[in-house]
Design a protein with these regions (language model features):
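Sec-dependent signal peptide recognition
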Residues: 2-10
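Intrinsically disordered, low-complexity, compositionally biased regions/tails
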Residues: 10-11, 31
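N-terminal signal peptide c-region/cleavage motif recognized by signal peptidases
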Residues: 14-16
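Boundary of Sec targeting at the N-terminus
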Residues: 19-20
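His/Glu-rich zincin catalytic helix
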Residues: 24
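Structured, acidic catalytic/metal-binding patches in enzyme active sites
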Residues: 27-34, 40-243
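Catalytic-pocket segment enriched in acidic/His residues
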Residues: 247
Length: 247
């Protein structure tokens, strides 16, 4: 049965260096083709006008699989699970995981960009902040991001409206565990400060990545994803395996 998979960006990068985001999978005994598209959470809907064959693929598919089933992600039950897993369960707090200087730096950044006072949320895991600080700074920088324009949500909602099956390749529980429990609180705190202390570089990198995606330049996206600083801020091989290759 045909399927239309909204894959995460780096899954798409792994396929080829050609300038295209939509891939047709056929042959090898398949009765009908399937399609794979690489999505990017910061890409506007206008990218769809540039993807050759997209409308045809959406029309022909009989089911749609995304990284996650977006309707479930928005459910009260899932939101409650996320609220539980993003909080520190032991005696640690943000102020004990960070030095006084780092806590002050992180708190200043979060107040200015996330409208969040860390003193009022001492049990938040650093990974929760880490997953938001770069995007928040990027959105503030470009000033024209529409959070309602999410490609994954669009593809799935279109499929639902047309009576097609929709599901996810991963569960919310799997992703929550990966993002918030995949590495120690100390490592989370270290990576948080790496990001905040280099926020301009991180925003510029994300800007370059988004521009490359809009050009469907997979070569450039791969190069950006492989850039390293040569210090403790770089992902370890184990972290890369968990986040990209072993999923």
């Amino acid at each position: 049965m045909k399927s239309f998979i909204g894959a995460v960006l780096f899954i798409c990068v792994a396929f080829s260096a050609n300038a295209q985001l939509l891939w047709k999978v056929s042959g090898n005994g398949l009765n009908q083709p399937s399609y794979i598209i690489g999505t990017h959470h910061l890409a506007p809907f206008s990218i769809m006008d540039s993807i050759a064959g997209l409308q045809k693929a959406m029309k022909e598919t009989q089911q749609v699989y995304g990284e996650l089933k977006m309707s479930e992600m928005q459910s009260p039950v899932t939101m409650q699970k996320m609220q539980q897993v993003m909080m520190i369960a032991n005696d640690s707090t943000l102020s004990t995981l960070l030095s006084p200087e780092d806590f002050a730096t992180a708190n200043k950044f979060c107040k200015e960009n996330l409208m969040l006072d860390l003193s009022a949320a001492p049990k938040l895991k650093p990974a929760f902040l880490l997953n938001n600080v770069v995007v928040a700074a990027y959105v503030k920088h470009i000033g024209k991001f529409n959070p309602q324009e999410q490609l994954d949500t669009f593809f799935q909602s279109q499929a639902t409206q047309n009576g097609k099956k929709v599901d996810g390749l991963e569960t919310a529980e799997f992703q929550f565990n990966l993002l918030f429990n995949g590495y120690s609180l100390q490592r989370q705190a270290q990576l948080l400060m790496c990001t905040i202390n280099n926020i301009n570089t991180e925003v510029e990198s994300l800007k370059k990545l988004t521009n490359a995606y809009m050009r469907q330049d997979l070569n450039q996206m791969l190069r950006i994803s492989e850039e390293r600083k040569g210090n403790q801020c770089d992902p370890t091989p184990g972290e890369e395996d968990a986040m990209i290759y072993n999923r």
